[in-house]
Amino acid sequence: MWKKTISLMVISACMTGNVVAQGIVDVHCHNILPFYLEALEKHDAAMDEGFPLPAWDAGAHLKFMDEAGIGCSILTMPAPQPYFNDTEECQQTIRRYNEYCAKLKADYPGRFRFCASLPLPDVEAAVREAIYALDTLGADGVKLATNCRGQYLGDEELDPLMKVLDERHAVIIVHPHRPTPYSEKIITTTPLAMYEYPAETTRAVVNMLARNILVRYPNLKLVVPHCGSFLPLALPRMKSILPAMVAQDYMQPIDWEANLSRLYFDLAGNPTPEVLHSLLTITTPDHILYGSDYPYLPDAVLKANLQRLKQMLAADEELAPYREDILWKNAERLFEGNAIDER
């Protein structure tokens, strides 16, 4: 059976009252590499998401992690997908990115991990890259965009990729990308990250649920970003309408329990108590993970966000028992079987 072992080194434990604070695991952060940015600039796509991509380097990221008390960061490629109607160029950029991340993982053991990018919308190329990244490079999972030039998660054409990932018990980190197609008039007044990203994430996950992807491929685990996006609002409506849709043969039945049991949710986006409790209407505390969204906000802002989250968890009677789980233990369990070892 295909297995791999991950060892996440956590920072030294320190006592905070009666709580042992372990190194936090950050499941939502990005590294913007020079050759990736060059590929975007070549096609005038560096501003495709409506805002400039921030600078990144390993030293600055490690400094932030040390100051914030983060033991391990799981890196993913940001948006946009480097595909501009040239499959070979996309494959080369993504292969270079994955190999760079594998070297980072080797150079900084226990500090950096990565979920590989795949050269979608070319499904055959994505299957090849997934096998190489997971089997040879030691990727800790894969990152999938909500859509790649209009090819959405849950679409039937992605089934061969889902099969390969399922065979490897892969963790999939989802990240929103610009919707395709889209209206310029809709997104000119607000950045994509403000509204359209949560809508895009919700759209993609609903598409996967509607096709029972996580039931048909039961070894997959999916990390949904930004506090579940709009799913806490969308799922009750979807559940209420589904029986009528099934009765008229517009949709198939959905195994809600099985699907939702394979969804995990990161807290990137500075969650409030209201947001967290809304998220708990569709999941349980053992499926909630810390995410910073580094480096898209200044270090000081991200550290303040994390401090507020810690205080909020400590003060919340329902969530206080799960403080360490949310900050790092749930990430260990998520990658279990890829067993994250505590040191």
Label for each model-derived stretch:
Residues W2, Q22-V27, N31-C72, E99-A106, ...:
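Mid-to-C-terminal alpha-helical segments outside catalytic/metal-binding sites
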Residues S7-N18:
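Bacterial N-terminal signal peptides
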Residues V25-C29, S73-L75, R113-A116, V142-L144, ...:
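Hydrophobic faces of well-ordered beta-strands that scaffold small-molecule active sites
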Residues V25-L40, I172-P181, G228-M238:
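Short, solvent-exposed beta-strand-terminating loops
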Residues F51-W56, P82-Y83, P119-A126, R149-E156, ...:
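Acidic-and-aromatic substrate-binding clefts and catalytic sites of carbohydrate-active enzymes
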Residues M77-V205:
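Active-site gating/metal-coordination segments in enzymes
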Residues Y182, T190-L209, K221, P225-R343:
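H/E-rich (His + Asp/Glu) clusters that bind or coordinate divalent metals
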